[in-house]
Regions:
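Basic, low-complexity intrinsically disordered segments
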Residues: 1-222
Length: 222
């Protein structure tokens, strides 16, 4: 405070650039072009989780906590077949719509596994979303991330229980190593030929948006 009172800033640009927050997060959001029913929105969640996992892997980050936010469409209140009678909120434009949903889940371990994150985000969406409502916006977040090296060091420092199943642990590590090789191969192909050079079956299903989003820059088409 005394330094600031005399107009002196002890924190240099070098300090600012060198600063790394102890807790980071990585997220992906999407505004759907039209209201999506539950199953179509579920497809989008799996697509987004897949790309988020690859983003983590590319940055050499891992996460142990995931969060999902779901914004419903105003159309839910005007369609009699939906018959919504829950909490209603207004958006910044004054439009009334069902209250948004929020869910989080602790994974129990740090990971950037595509298989794990797609499965866990899918479970979280099914648990959090109202299956009868139309979805308009989705946001997926890896809310607590560490770099792989730090996470590995922390794991190595943990004392292994005498009762731990060594064979199960070895099998899990082997499975993880195989997936990492697959992720590395996918990453290299996408870097060389573009993100759409290697897609999954779900990216070609009706209502999928991953392929078109890969062609966008900053949310706009190239």
């Amino acid at each position: 405070l005394i330094d600031h009172a005399w107009g002196y800033e002890p924190c240099t640009i070098k300090d600012v650039k060198a600063y790394k927050p102890s807790v980071n997060s990585l997220s992906s959001g999407q505004v759907l072009q039209e209201p999506y029913p539950f199953e179509k929105a579920r497809l989008i969640v799996k697509e987004m989780a897949d790309f988020l996992a690859m983003d983590l892997f590319e940055k050499r980050l891992v996460t142990n906590q995931i969060v999902i936010d779901i914004v419903y469409d105003a159309e839910n209140l005007s369609r009699p077949e939906i018959n919504y009678n829950g909490e209603v909120k207004e958006d910044r434009y004054g439009r009334k719509m069902p209250a948004a949903a929020h869910g989080s889940h602790n994974l129990g371990k740090f990971t950037s596994s595509t298989a794990v994150l797609v499965e866990e985000f899918d479970k979280l969406f099914r648990k959090t979303a109202n299956h009868d409502l139309l979805v308009r916006k989705l946001n997926l977040c890896a809310s607590f991330t560490l770099d792989e090296k730090t996470a590995a060091e922390n794991r190595a420092a943990e004392q292994i229980s005498f009762f731990d199943d060594a064979s199960a642990t070895a099998s899990e590590e082997e499975k993880t190593a195989k997936e990492r090789k697959r992720q590395e191969a996918v990453l290299e192909i996408r870097k060389k030929y573009g993100k759409n050079a290697m897609l999954k079956g779900m990216n070609f299903e009706q209502g999928a948006t991953g392929k078109s989003r890969n062609k966008q820059i900053g949310g706009h088409k190239e």
